[in-house]
């Protein structure tokens, strides 16, 4: 396709099917607004060109997939497939999109199938990622970590090695999800992409947010079942929501209060998932635990309402789902249902959430799931294990152990987090 007027020149290749584009590239730019509102014309406005390219690419990718029939079954080639597009952008929306960029969608049919299995409609997925710009939650040595504007999706920057590891485990992961009928604590992988801007490649994986898009998390733990070097640093502890670790959990005498049936269901899922990770020789994963305090949240909401009334203006962040602001997107499901009260959640959306038991000291909601599952027990880990054994002694509780030992120790630790 050649460039004419305000249209970008596009060349597209796909390992499965090649179809038309241009649903997102045919109109004028709208005036910039502060609030999260739907842009009738998709201009993919973001402060970072990379995020604009991600929004553009996801929009294009989903529009293409909608035109391709859903296969009766996935074939081995689908787990190696990709769809690529190269865009030369002269005039259209040039204040937001780079003049040249490339977008690659890995295994589109596989992730489409996973989204369907996890109860996420493709168009809701598209809206949640493209209606308004995602915002940066944190940035560290592991890359950026973003949330979709409606807080239902996590967008994580990963390495090319992570992409290779995902390709190795993807068919096993898919098989596991099918086998357990989507009843899992593993991350829900929903899409994986490569963005190329200014001759630099960035790799992105999209997952369901383990925390609620609606209920605030007041305490957060990353638990591995290891006690060596597993305490949050002083620098971490002064953050508004620090990521606390195993030693912090024990030192604070923290407990998770759920009834016996919920505990049994949770541990069944966890054991099944950990067995799967051990079989693939994966390790270094963590249990992410988020705690929502219901009474504290009610107090905070009252204070916010008082502030809002005093200022008589809307907050720049829309609490999607709480007040029914989005007719679409993943959180849009809530709008056809009655409003949720304090500490209530919709299990279809907050799939990792568990309510505290009636005999808990205070009313809480827990969000628990497995994260960082891509570390393979390779030569690097073996070397690290040898070094740590020399430093701490053979019997020390160190995190770098064989996958079998890691899984066993992890399950033992998590069993004991419950009251």
Swiss-Prot record:
Residues 46-418 form the PIPK domain. GO terms for biological process: 1-phosphatidyl-1D-myo-inositol 4,5-bisphosphate biosynthetic process; phosphatidylinositol phosphate biosynthetic process. It comes from Xenopus laevis (African clawed frog). One of its GO terms (molecular function) is 1-phosphatidylinositol-4-phosphate 5-kinase activity. It catalyses: a 1,2-diacyl-sn-glycero-3-phospho-(1D-myo-inositol-5-phosphate) + ATP = a 1,2-diacyl-sn-glycero-3-phospho-(1D-myo-inositol-4,5-bisphosphate) + ADP + H(+); 1,2-dihexadecanoyl-sn-glycero-3-phospho-(1D-myo-inositol-5-phosphate) + ATP = 1,2-dihexadecanoyl-sn-glycero-3-phospho-(1D-myo-inositol-4,5-bisphosphate) + ADP + H(+); 1,2-dihexadecanoyl-sn-glycero-3-phospho-(1D-myo-inositol-5-phosphate) + GTP = 1,2-dihexadecanoyl-sn-glycero-3-phospho-(1D-myo-inositol-4,5-bisphosphate) + GDP + H(+). Keywords: ATP-binding, Cytoplasm, Endoplasmic reticulum, Kinase, Lipid metabolism, Nucleotide-binding, Transferase. SUPFAM superfamilies: SAICAR synthase-like. PANTHER family: PHOSPHATIDYLINOSITOL 5-PHOSPHATE 4-KINASE TYPE-2 GAMMA, PHOSPHATIDYLINOSITOL-4-PHOSPHATE 5-KINASE. It is found in: Endoplasmic reticulum; Cytoplasm. The gene is pip4k2c. One of its GO terms (cellular component) is endoplasmic reticulum. Its main location: endoplasmic reticulum. Phosphorylated, phosphorylation is induced by EGF. Phosphatidylinositol 5-phosphate 4-kinase with low enzymatic activity. May be a GTP sensor, has higher GTP-dependent kinase activity than ATP-dependent kinase activity. Its EC number is 2.7.1.149. Pfam families: PIP5K (PF01504). The keyword Lipid metabolism applies. This is Phosphatidylinositol 5-phosphate 4-kinase type-2 gamma. It comes from the Eukaryota. It is an enzyme of class 2 (transferase).
């Amino acid at each position: 396709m050649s460039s004419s007027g305000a249209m970008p020149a596009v060349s597209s290749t796909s390992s499965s099917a090649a179809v038309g584009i241009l649903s997102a590239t045919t109109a004028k730019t709208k005036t910039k607004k502060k609030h999260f509102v739907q842009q009738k014309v998709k201009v993919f406005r973001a402060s970072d060109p990379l995020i604009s390219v991600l929004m553009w690419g996801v929009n294009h990718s989903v529009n293409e997939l909608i035109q391709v029939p859903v296969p009766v079954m996935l074939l081995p080639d689908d787990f190696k497939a990709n769809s690529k597009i190269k865009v030369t952008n002269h005039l259209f929306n040039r204040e937001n999109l780079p003049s040249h960029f490339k977008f690659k969608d890995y295994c589109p049919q596989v992730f489409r199938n996973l989204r369907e299995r996890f109860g996420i409609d493709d168009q809701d997925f598209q809206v949640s990622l493209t209606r308004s710009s995602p915002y940066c939650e944190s940035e560290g040595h592991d890359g950026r970590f973003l949330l979709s504007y409606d807080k239902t999706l996590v967008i994580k920057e990963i390495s090319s090695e992570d992409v290779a590891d995902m390709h190795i485990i993807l068919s096993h992961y898919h098989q596991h999800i099918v086998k357990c009928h989507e009843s899992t604590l593993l991350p829900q992988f929903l899409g994986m992409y490569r963005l190329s801007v200014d001759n630099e490649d960035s790799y992105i994986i999209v997952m369901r947010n383990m925390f609620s898009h609606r209920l605030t998390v007041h305490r957060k733990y990353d638990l591995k079942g290891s006690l060596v070097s597993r305490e949050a640093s002083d620098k971490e502890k002064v953050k508004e929501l620090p990521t606390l670790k195993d030693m912090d959990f024990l030192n604070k005498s923290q407990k998770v209060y759920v009834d016996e049936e919920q505990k049994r269901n949770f541990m069944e899922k966890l054991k099944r998932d950990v067995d799967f990770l051990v079989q693939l020789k994966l390790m270094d994963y963590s249990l992410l635990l988020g705690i929502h305090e219901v009474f504290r949240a009610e107090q905070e909401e009252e204070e916010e309402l008082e502030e809002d009334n005093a200022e008589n203006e809307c907050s720049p962040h829309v609490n999607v789902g709480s007040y029914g602001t989005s007719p679409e997107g993943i959180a849009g499901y809530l709008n056809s249902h009655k409003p949720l009260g304090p500490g209530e959640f919709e299990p279809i959306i907050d799939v990792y959430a568990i309510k505290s038991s009636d005999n808990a000291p205070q009313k809480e909601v827990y969000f628990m799931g497995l994260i960082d599952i891509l570390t393979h027990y390779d030569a690097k880990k073996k070397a690290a294990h040898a070094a740590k054994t020399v430093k701490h002694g053979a019997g020390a509780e160190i995190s770098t152990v064989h996958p079998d030992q890691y899984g066993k120790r992890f399950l033992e630790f998590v069993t004991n987090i419950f009251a």
